[in-house]
């Protein structure tokens, strides 16, 4: 198994490979820093299972916990710090979040980095005010408006409320989150390169996200509410923002010429880069994005045949400071019997060999046998 270089054209596979069907091995931090060097991630279970969870430590949680067991970000959203009590995850949640379209601000800045930074800070301040307005709307609601969360005592301290009470004193434990998308495309619009291509651009990009975190921290102190910065996942928003900006500004090479903006602070998936460098570039943002973050890498091959390589990637993520990491591996698909998983020269389900001709009768037999 070798590492995948992003942007390279993948060689043809022996069996039909579905790009949409990928197993994700999501690895959450679960060990204190003191034992990081002794961490050994065992992945032998991959042989029997298509999915396996593993745990490792990074520095993003240890300020709040004597970490023991698996700590979940709930797939990007992270609720930890609390200005109104203990920094726990139970009985709390994210109240709302708003995402800033960084590429649009960069296009409007016409290559001026100073103007762009001012725009980012100004829009971020607007987002804080918007989140405050949302909070006020939610805070004036009554317990009976939330029969499950409040009426059943799911939300922290809600068991002390009566049916007609406002929920303000309860939802203040929640988070109000500012997010961002398209850092890579924003840098291309400003400098002609993104943060995966140039160290100076990477330094500026980091300062941009750092300024967003400062806006959140300042708002937390000023309003005594839990404002946080999230590396927005934006699976749907990434395409919507791009379509809107292409309609307004036209096709801009490296910015609006694709069907999507790159999620948050990620290096573009189409850019050729080693997994190690990708981790190094994205890791510093995890500490800034205290409202949630994730980084992906992809391995091209059967991880069950080389668990040491898989383990090396996980350890590298841990040492780099990745707070939430995912390792994707391609999944093969046999169109005859419908088997999904790792396929070598022979399908483990029906025994069909690579390139073997199959009669129509045999196909019908296999599909009937496996209920396809």
PLM regions and their residue ranges:
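Extended amphipathic alpha-helical segments with heptad-repeat/coiled-coil character used for oligomerization
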Residues: 217-265
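Aromatic/basic-lined ligand-recognition segments
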Residues: 78-84, 249-282
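Conserved structured core elements
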Residues: 37-40, 52, 94, 114-117, ...
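Short secondary-structure subsegments characteristic of cysteine-rich extracellular domains
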Residues: 62-74, 196-216
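Flexible loop/turn segments at secondary-structure boundaries
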Residues: 53, 64-67, 105-110, 192-194, ...
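Autoprocessing domains of the Hint superfamily
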Residues: 1-74, 267-372
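Structured mid-domain segments that build the active-site/substrate or prosthetic-cofactor binding neighborhood
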Residues: 75-181, 185-189, 194, 301, ...
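A glycine-rich phosphate-binding loop feature that marks nucleotide/adenosyl-phosphate handling sites
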Residues: 8-12, 18-28, 140-165, 209, ...
